[in-house]
A protein has these predicted regions:
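Bacterial Sec-dependent N-terminal signal peptides
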Residues: 1-25
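Intrinsic disorder/low-complexity detector
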Residues: 9, 29, 81, 245-246
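A generic structural signal for short, non-catalytic loop/turn and secondary-structure boundary residues
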Residues: 11-13, 72-73, 98
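N-terminal module-boundary/linker segments of secreted carbohydrate-active enzymes
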Residues: 21-86
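Intrinsically disordered, low-complexity segments enriched in small/polar residues
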Residues: 22, 27, 56-59, 92, ...
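Short amphipathic alpha-helical surface micro-motifs
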Residues: 59-64, 85-86, 91-93, 111, ...
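Short, His- and charge-rich active-site/binding loops that engage polyanionic ligands
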Residues: 77-79, 83-102
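Domain-level detector of nuclease and nuclease-like folds
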Residues: 95-248
């Protein structure tokens, strides 16, 4: 799935970014013309129609793409689940016994929720490189917040534990504050890009997050949390650079 930074930023914040509609490819001001003046569900559906054509790079193609989309300034893999890893892009084979052994492909929306179906399984917007061990500890738990973690990655960067977020008390995976906005925007993108599918992503723990409909797509506690995350962690240069690389 290829999507420009303008697309992703808009989709991520579709409930309150009408002011961005004037932008488009090469600043032509035409890309979002069909969605001008819309709001709420109508806006989301209009954006879905605009971005739905896409190119599927395939699951096996993700690792090669990561070399462009998730490269740190020092040439290592940009891992948002761990702050202590220094993976080379070839460090994606073999097993892991501890944090730092290898990285793999993490589905921010667990693929078990949508039964590993395509094209979601290989959508590089939401399938990101992360430490394999920490990814495994995340399992298919929803994203959330915990104040009594049962597991923390090195230096307390990521956490697993009972939710302290109002509206949900189950086990959650809490990413670091500096990436919560990134994840929120990915989730809004997924709700928009797959508007015609997301209602069925309720397998396993999916029903704790997915509302079973096109709009608003997520359960109230999730929407409230994601909007707060998006506000508290605005779009970073790292996020812009990644989206630009994905678009290429």
């Amino acid at each position: 799935m290829f999507i420009s930074k303008r697309n992703l930023s808009l989709l991520a914040l579709f409930v309150f970014v009408l002011q961005l509609f004037a932008q488009g490819p090469n600043n032509t001001g035409t890309y979002y013309k069909a969605a001008t003046g819309m709001k709420g569900q109508a806006l989301k559906t209009a954006l879905f129609a605009i971005i739905s054509p896409h190119h599927n790079i395939g699951y096996d193609g993700l690792y090669k793409c990561y070399e462009q989309t998730d490269r740190r300034a020092d040439g290592k893999v940009w891992d948002i689940y761990s702050c202590t890893t220094n993976f080379s892009f070839s460090d994606n084979v073999g097993g892991y016994k501890r944090e730092g052994d290898m990285y793999n492909r993490e589905h921010t929306i667990p693929q078990s929720w949508f039964k590993k179906a395509s094209p979601m399984k290989a959508d590089i917007v939401h399938v990101i490189p992360t430490d394999g061990y920490v990814n495994n500890r995340r399992s298919s738990y929803p994203f959330g917040e915990t104040n009594s973690p049962t597991y923390t990655s090195n230096k307390g960067f990521s956490k697993v534990g009972p939710s302290c977020t109002e509206g949900y008390s189950g086990t959650v995976f809490e990413p670091n504050d500096e990436y919560k906005g990134d994840i929120a925007r990915i989730y809004f993108y997924m709700a928009t890009c797959y508007e015609d599918r997301i209602g069925s992503w309720t397998n396993g723990t999916g029903n704790t997050v997915i509302a079973g409909n096109k709009y608003p797509a997520y359960n109230p506690w999730v929407i409230k949390m994601l909007l707060r995350w998006a506000k508290e962690d605005p779009v970073s240069q790292k996020e812009i650079d990644r989206n630009n690389a994905v678009y290429k």
